[in-house]
């Protein structure tokens, strides 16, 4: 067991020796490294500029990266933690799995024998039941075949707007194609379809 302790001690010392404290703007004379000329420093201090660069953080971001942070991490401007992936839009129902996969990029799906459970939709604003509507919107008196399935976070995100409006009509058509007997059953009774014999 003693060699294991020595190994742990050696790794601890090695990792601690590689850390160099980053001087803060108000810490003029408080840094741990004395201000000696470069010739008087020891051999271990040669790596200091590299370590200081690593501790100070990455170089300034490009405009594309700043735009991505603005799009996906609104907390960045508020000083909060920035997550690499965030939601693109908010689905109106959990049952629309395609929408949940599209909108909530950081979703984790847990498979259970009974059902697939969504986990991680903490900021979901809809109800668990699917929306029922006749297709009429208050602003348009005629029936609409394009109903919204989600609400985009950014109003300028044309791909998201296209997905949230167009794809719902496609999924409705595919649903009737997968279950044609539910749609045709009432129609066959009215058209003189199969009737029970007396």
Curated annotation (Swiss-Prot):
Q: Which SMART domains match?
A: END (SM00272)
Where in or outside the cell is it found?
Secreted
Principal cellular location given in the protein's record: secreted
Give a brief account of the tissues where this protein occurs. Expressed in which included heart, lung, liver, kidney, spleen, stomach, pancreas, duodenum, colon, uterus, ovary and testis.
Q: Name one GO molecular function term.
A: hormone activity
User: Signal sequence span per UniProt?
Assistant: 1-16
Region feature Disordered, mapped onto this chain:
22-79, 174-198
The record's keywords, sorted A to Z, are:
Cleavage on pair of basic residues, Disulfide bond, Secreted, Signal, Vasoactive, Vasoconstrictor
Site (Cleavage): residue numbering on this chain: 109-110
User: Which residues does the annotated region (Endothelin-like) include?
Assistant: 150-164
Q: Which residues are assigned to the propeptide feature?
A: 17-86, 110-198
Task: Please name the GO terms of the biological process aspect recorded for this protein, alphabetically.
Answer: intracellular calcium ion homeostasis; positive regulation of smooth muscle contraction; regulation of systemic arterial blood pressure by endothelin; regulation of vasoconstriction; vein smooth muscle contraction
Q: Which pairs are disulfide-linked?
A: 89-103, 91-99
- Quote the function comment for this protein: Endothelins are endothelium-derived vasoconstrictor peptides.
Name the protein family. Belongs to the endothelin/sarafotoxin family.
Q: Which PANTHER family match?
A: ENDOTHELIN (PTHR13874), ENDOTHELIN-3 (PTHR13874:SF11)
- This one is known as Endothelin-3
Gene name in the database record: EDN3
């Amino acid at each position: 067991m003693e060699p294991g302790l020595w190994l742990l001690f050696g790794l601890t010392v090695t990792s601690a020796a590689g850390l160099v404290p980053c001087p803060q703007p108000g810490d003029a004379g408080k840094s741990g490294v004395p201000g000696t000329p470069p010739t008087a420093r020891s051999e271990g201090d040669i790596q200091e500029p590299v370590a200081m660069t690593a501790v100070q953080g990455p170089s300034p971001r490009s405009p594309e990266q700043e735009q991505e942070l603005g799009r996906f991490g609104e907390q960045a401007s508020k000083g909060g933690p920035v997550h690499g992936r965030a939601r693109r839009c908010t689905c109106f129902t959990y049952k629309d799995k395609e929408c949940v996969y599209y909108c909530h990029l950081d979703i984790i799906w847990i498979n259970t024998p009974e059902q697939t459970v969504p986990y991680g939709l903490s900021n979901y604003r809809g109800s668990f039941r699917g929306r029922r509507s006749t297709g009429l919107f208050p602003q348009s008196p005629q029936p609409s075949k394009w109903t919204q399935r989600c609400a985009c976070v950014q109003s300028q995100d044309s791909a998201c707007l296209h997905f949230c409006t167009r794809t719902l009509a496609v999924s409705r058509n595919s649903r009737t194609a997968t279950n044609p007997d539910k749609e045709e059953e009432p129609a066959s009774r009215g058209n003189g379809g199969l009737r029970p014999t007396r």
